[in-house]
Regions:
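N-terminal secretory signal peptides
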Residues: 1-8, 12-23
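Sec/Tat signal peptide C-region and signal peptidase I cleavage site
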Residues: 25-30
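Zn-dependent metallo-beta-lactamase
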Residues: 31-100, 110, 338
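C-terminal regulatory/interaction regions
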Residues: 32-36, 44, 296-338
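Active-site HxH/HxHxD metal-binding segment of metal-dependent hydrolases
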Residues: 34-46, 111-115, 121-188, 291, ...
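Conserved beta-strand hairpin/beta-sheet module of binuclear metal-dependent hydrolase folds
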Residues: 69-124, 210-231
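Structural recognition of the beta-strand scaffold that forms the well-ordered cores
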Residues: 84, 96, 102-104, 132-136, ...
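Metallo-beta-lactamase
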Residues: 101, 108-110, 178, 188-190, ...
Length: 338
């Protein structure tokens, strides 16, 4: 294992935060006028067009959005070195390295770990005893619920950003893991032949992290990102933090050449449908998770535009302006999911 602190990542986030009033100030200043939120939502929808991945993102970030119950998919290796196991609602992503497994998220409970993660990894030829790290992308129970079970059974180390370790300690939810390793902004974790870079992307929670890592498809190398927390927070100030994270992470993606988009909630980005497309072979020799660098950047631009709309919805509600269609003003996001 080697940890390397990126000198640029924290600076990138701070610069993005500092520039936010300049980049978006004029737009946000006028966002309190009637219909401004709807303009953002309509713009995002136009950018998404008929792209099923982007359209699903628009839906997931729209005011009042809810994740429906769906049947859990069968486990699948979506890349040569990446496996996904899922409850349908939430997924765990296993990075298969020459030195063992880095598991991003651990589903919702010890039972999920015992009855889903362990047997389903085995069904894909992955030995769960080789899980070396469990990374909680953020401090909600649907992401860390099985972490302590894996730590107890296999000696896996559990990683989370300090802000969300504190969140977990304050909330004291069921199945919370014991505090173990902190994730620093820009930190690199190397296991075997794979290095993962973690970026702080606060907003969904104070300590949400989004990793960037190499993947292989039929021997060809690509670069993936996994957005750590999708559901926008309730408070307007936290939505602004989310927006700053989107801007900073977009720059990091561009710098890294990200051409693969992943999410821990597959209904937020058409990920479950893409799993079935890949499983059924309807994508031919291609991989539907390889969306290309320009489309990955457009994905983030859609996210940015939707967040500007959500901020505008809050402002319209606070000034007595009629909220955009489908909005109830400051939307009460589900506090412990997504």
């Amino acid at each position: 294992m080697s940890f390397e602190q990126s000198r640029l990542s924290r600076r990138t986030l701070l610069v993005a935060s500092a520039l936010l009033p300049l980049a978006g100030g004029a737009a946000e200043a006028s966002a309190a006028t009637a219909g401004r939120a709807k303009e953002y939502y309509d713009r995002a929808a136009r950018m998404a067009g008929d792209d099923p991945v982007l359209r699903q993102l628009v839906k997931a970030l729209s005011p009042g959005a809810a994740i429906p119950e769906v049947k859990a998919p069968k486990p699948l290796k979506i890349f040569d070195n990446v496996a996904v196991v899922s409850t349908g609602f939430v997924s765990a992503t296993a990075l298969l390295t020459s030195g063992g497994v880095i598991l991003i998220d651990a589903l919702g409970s010890p039972d999920d770990a015992k009855k889903i993660i362990v047997p389903e990894l085995r069904s894909l030829g992955v030995d769960p005893s080789t899980i070396k790290y469990v990374v909680a992308a953020h401090g909600h129970s649907d992401h860390f619920g099985g972490a302590q079970y894996l730590a107890d059974q296999y000696g896996a180390r559990v990683m989370m950003a300090p802000a969300d370790w504190r969140l977990v300690a304050a909330d004291r939810p069921a199945n919370a893991p014991k505090r173990d390793l902190d994730i620093a902004d820009g930190q690199r974790l190397t296991l075997g032949d794979t290095t993962v870079t973690f970026h702080n992307t606060p907003g969904h929670t104070p300590g949400t992290v989004s990793p960037i890592f190499p993947v292989r498809w039929k021997g060809q190398r690509h670069t993936a990102m996994l957005w750590g927390g999708t559901n926008p927070p309730t408070a307007t100030k936290d939505k602004r933090t989310y927006l700053a994270s989107v801007l900073a992470f977009t720059a990091r993606m561009r710098q890294a050449g990200v051409d693969v988009e992943l999410n821990n909630h597959g209904l937020c980005d058409n990920g479950l449908a893409r799993m079935e497309e890949l499983r059924g072979g309807s994508s031919g020799a291609g991989n539907p998770f390889v969306i290309g660098a320009p489309r990955a950047q457009r994905f983030m631009k859609v996210m940015e535009t939707m967040m500007r709309g959500r901020i505008a919805s809050d402002q319209e509600a606070s000034t007595g302006t009629r909220p955009a269609a489908g909005s109830a003003g400051p939307v009460r996001s589900i506090p412990d999911c997504c």
